[in-house]
């Protein structure tokens, strides 16, 4: 009998104090009545980089191939991975206007993190009262606060 893939909901957010500046990311993973919170950050980063890192770290935390519904308030992340990335690759990591793609390494890492999962990307409006998006945002801000307090991010 074939085993059924685990269905996981992931909620992500990134935050940056200054852009660039100190940034944090947060993610909530939910499956079969269980939840796990993840967060981290970088001392010199951008909001878009933290949005990407939230999705990357959440997907990498999965221990087996899963069916994933990933919710982000970043149109940049959702469109980048679901609409733009194939064109970027065909154009040798250049945009339609021939500029180098920003955050290329993170996009490549995100694509790799998605490769063993079936990921459905969903956009949610940020700062609009969506409970899990608000929690992911709070985790991202917690990472920034911890860095400011003791000079390091959670591990």
From Swiss-Prot:
The Gene Ontology CC terms held by the record are:
cytoplasm
Boundaries of each RNase H type-1 domain copy? 4-145
- Binding, Mg(2+) 2: 13, 137
Q: Does Translocase count among this protein's keywords?
A: no
Q: Where in the cell is it found?
A: Cytoplasm
- Binding residue positions for Mg(2+) 1: 13, 51, 73
Which UniProt key words apply to this protein? Cytoplasm, Endonuclease, Hydrolase, Magnesium, Metal-binding, Nuclease
Superkingdom of source: Bacteria
Q: Which GO terms describe its molecular function?
A: magnesium ion binding; nucleic acid binding; RNA-DNA hybrid ribonuclease activity
Which SUPFAM superfamilies does the entry link to? Ribonuclease H-like (SSF53098)
Q: Which cofactor does it need?
A: Mg(2+)
Catalytic activity entry: Endonucleolytic cleavage to 5'-phosphomonoester
Does the keyword section mention DNA-binding?
Answer: no
EC nos: 3.1.26.4
* Enzyme class (EC, first level): hydrolase
Q: Name one GO biological process term.
A: DNA replication, removal of RNA primer
Quote the cofactor binding remark. Answer: Binds 1 Mg(2+) ion per subunit. May bind a second metal ion at a regulatory site, or after substrate binding.
Instruction: State how it assembles.
Output: Monomer.
Family to which this protein belongs: Belongs to the RNase H family.
**Classification via NCBIfam families:** PRK00203.1 (NF001236)
**Role summary:** Endonuclease that specifically degrades the RNA of RNA-DNA hybrids.
The protein's name: Ribonuclease H
Taxonomy of the source species:
Bacteria, Pseudomonadati, Pseudomonadota, Alphaproteobacteria, Hyphomicrobiales
Q: Which gene encodes it?
A: rnhA
């Amino acid at each position: 009998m074939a085993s059924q893939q685990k269905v996981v909901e992931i909620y992500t957010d990134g935050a940056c104090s200054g852009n660039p500046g100190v940034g944090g990311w947060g993610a909530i993973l939910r499956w079969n009545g269980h939840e796990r919170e993840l967060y981290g950050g970088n001392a010199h980063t951008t909001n878009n980089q933290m949005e990407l890192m939230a999705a990357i770290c959440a997907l990498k935390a999965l221990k087996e191939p899963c069916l994933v519904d990933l919710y982000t308030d970043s149109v940049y992340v959702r469109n980048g991975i679901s609409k733009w990335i194939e064109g970027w690759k065909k154009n040798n990591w250049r945009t339609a206007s021939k500029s180098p793609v920003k955050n290329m390494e993170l996009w490549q890492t995100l694509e790799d993190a998605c490769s063993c999962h079936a990921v459905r990307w969903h956009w949610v409006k940020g700062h609009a009262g969506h409970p899990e998006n608000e929690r992911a945002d709070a985790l991202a801000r917690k990472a920034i606060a911890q860095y400011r307090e003791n000079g390091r991010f959670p591990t």
